[in-house]
Amino acid sequence: MSRRYFGTDGIRGRANGLITPELAMKVGQAAGLVFQRGEHRHRVVIGKDTRLSGYMIEYALVAGFTSVGMDVLLLGPMPTPAVAMLTKSMRADLGVMISASHNLFEDNGIKMFGPRGFKLSDEVEKKIEKLLDENLDKKLAQSRNLGRARRIDGVHDRYIEFAKRTLPRELSLEGLRVVVDCAHGAAYKVVPEALWELGADVVPIGVEPDGLNINKECGSTAPEALCRKVREMRGDIGIALDGDADRVIIVDERGHVVDGDQLLAVIAESWKEDGRLTKPGIVATVMSNLGLERFLKDRDLSLVRTPVGDRYVLEQMLKQGYNLGGEQSGHIILSDYATTGDGFVSALQVLAVVQKLGRPVSQVCHKFEPLPQILKNFRYRNGKPLDRAEVKSAITAGEKRLNGHGRLLVRSSGTEPVIRVMGEGDDRILVEEVVDTIVSALGNPAVA
C-alpha cells in the first residue's frame, strides 16, 4: 500500500494546502479509532509550535478526537520531545505534535507518538491512512460518549525538571555565558528558563514568536544570527534549536558552527570514558561524515548507519541495544533519557562535557576533520526523476569514480519534492565534479 499522507516524519505540507482543517479533523478521528484500545477512558495530548496555522489545526484535531470519544489534553506551545515525554508521563493513549519542524511558517504538520512516547511504526501509520480514505460517519461516538477537551497548566515546569534531571545534581552552569536561539519556536519559554535555573548567564534570541517568523533566518538551519550574537556578546557557547526543538546545532566561542556529527563524537567519547555506552558504538545515518566513522574507529567504537530520518536511527538503537544515535542535522537521540530527538537535552550533555573539562568549546567540540562533503538539492514539480535512464547512468558513473575514495548518496526527501545529491571524499574537486554531473542529469540548476 502506497503512503498518500505520511512521510518520514508524520504528515507535513502547506497549511491550507495539504494540511487543511478537514484533513486534520479526519486524522483525529482515524488516529482516535486506531488507539481506542481497552475499556478505559481514552485520552490524547496535543502540543504545537508557534505557527499561525497551529490554532486552526489544533481545534480541528480536537473536533476529530472528541467526535470518536477521546478526551483531549491541550499543552500549548511545547517542544516535540516534551510532547513525547508527557504522552508517557500523563498515561495518554496517544500524543500529537503540530509542527513542520525546521520549515518556515507556511508549512505545518502532524506527528504522533504512541503511549510509550515513541513515534508510530509504519504499520500503525498505514492503519491510520486506510481510515483516512474511508467514510467514518458510522464510527463516530454517540452523543453521551463524546470526548472532552481542556488545557493543562504547569507543563512547562514538568519539562524543565525533566531536562535538568539529565545532568548530575552537583553540576552547575555557573560561569558560562550561553547564547540560545529558540528559532521563535516551541522552546522559546522553557529553554531560557531551564538554562537560567541551571546557573548559566543566558542571552536568549529567537524568543519573540509572532506566528510568521518561526525558523526565519534563525535557529539550527540558519545559525548565522547566533554566530554573530555569540561573538558580539562574547558568549562561551551558542545553542541553536529548530522550530520544534528536536534538533540542535552548537556554536563555539569564536562563532564557528558545530554540527550533529561533531556532537555525536563529543558525547560518544565522553560516555565511553564514563562507561555509559551500552554498546561500543553509536547509530547514525548515511549522511554522517566519513570523518566521524574514522574518529569512532580510532577509539574502538563502531558506527551503524541507517536511512535518513531519526525514526530509523531510533529503530536500530532499540533493535541492537545502542543508547546514542543521531543525525548530522542535529537530531541527537539519547535513549537513556528520551524516546525521540531532544535538542535541549543533547545540548545539556555537551555543556556537561565543557564544564567537566574546563576548556573552551572550540577545543572540546571540534573532534575530527570532516572530509569534504558536497550536498546539493534538486527541487522538482512532478514525475520521478530518479527513474530516468540518464540519471541512473550518471549515478553509476559517479559511484565508479569515487570507488575507494569516497561515498555518493542520491535520495528523495521524505518530506518535500526534493532530491538530495551528496558526495564526500578526500578529493574535494573530484567530489564536486561527480555531484554536479548528477545534478545536471536531473535537469535543472541545484540549490546548494
UniProtKB/Swiss-Prot annotation:
Q: What is its EC number?
A: 5.4.2.10
Task: Tell me which SUPFAM superfamilies the record gives.
Answer: Phosphoglucomutase, C-terminal domain, Phosphoglucomutase, first 3 domains
Q: Which cofactor does it need?
A: Mg(2+)
Q: Domain of life of the organism in this record?
A: Bacteria
Query: Does Iron appear among the keywords?
Result: no
Note whether Transferase occurs among the keywords: no
Q: Which residues does the Swiss-Prot or TrEMBL record annotate as the active site?
A: S101
**Which CDD domains does the entry mention?**
GlmM
Residues bound to Mg(2+) are: S101, D242, D244, D246
Swiss-Prot/TrEMBL keywords: Isomerase, Magnesium, Metal-binding, Phosphoprotein
Q: Which InterPro entries match?
A: A-D-PHexomutase_a/b/a-I, A-D-PHexomutase_a/b/a-I/II/III, A-D-PHexomutase_a/b/a-II, A-D-PHexomutase_a/b/a-III, A-D-PHexomutase_C, A-D-PHexomutase_C_sf, Alpha-D-phosphohexomutase_SF, GlmM_bact
Report the residues modified as Phosphoserine.
Answer: S101
Q: Quote the cellular component terms of the Gene Ontology held in the record.
A: cytosol
Name a Pfam family for this protein: PGM_PMM_III
Write out the catalysed reaction.
alpha-D-glucosamine 1-phosphate = D-glucosamine 6-phosphate
Q: What class of enzyme is it?
A: isomerase
User: Which BP terms does GO give this entry?
Assistant: carbohydrate metabolic process; peptidoglycan biosynthetic process; UDP-N-acetylglucosamine biosynthetic process
Its PTM note reads: Activated by phosphorylation.
The protein's role, per its UniProt record: Catalyzes the conversion of glucosamine-6-phosphate to glucosamine-1-phosphate.
Q: Which family does it belong to?
A: Belongs to the phosphohexose mutase family.
> Which protein is depicted?
Phosphoglucosamine mutase
Q: Which gene encodes it?
A: glmM
